[in-house]
Amino acid sequence: MKFRNMTGINLKIAIPTNRPQAVVNYINALAQLDSHGEAGRCFNPSDYDGLLLPGGWDVNPSRYGKDRIPQETVDDDLDALQFEALDRFLTAGKPVFGICRGHQLLNIAFGGTLIQHLPCAGNHTSLPTGEDNVHRTRIEQNSFIHLIYGAGCTVNSSHHQGVEHPGKGLRAVMYSEDGVIEALEHDSLPVWSVQWHPERMCFSHSRNDTADGSLVFRFFLEQCQKRK
């Protein structure tokens, strides 16, 4: 997929969080593409071009009908503000992109469920050195992620949960080698997500052993620009 020149695009992207310091990598990636990511608790969708749901702690499993397990770390305040932001932006018809926790939260919002602790979690969590694991993926044709990367690519991995059943209208379009759903897209709404961390695969965080994560941000910004 060939992307347009992002110079001067100057889009505003809302990033709902209660820990602004935790979303710096997302803001920096957007800035490299001449766009502004704004961290905060509450947003008016009319003031923004899109919503980015970032990585973070686990979503409380009570939101998808399950009990907590010892391996989970939840933040109910973060859940509340992000679900509220998502509802507002969906109602406004604005593009939404989820990353890691954001990918899982989107799935829950559409009625899907999560695997609370992957049997293969060791293959997907960070290494003892703090570096992300990496793995190959298989990508479905006729999907947003196939337009970007083709039939497959190598991505990073830093999570212990995964999508179990996709929510209403969501389609799984990318899988890890051990079957974990690595990307979702909605069949009619401007909604996309990935389980991995493209912000740690681009610009100053580029890696020789993974795909270029900036292409995900370019895709999202193009979709936001088209809907201005």
Residues covered by each model-derived region:
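Short, surface-exposed beta-strand/loop micro-motifs that present aromatic residues
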Residues: 180-187
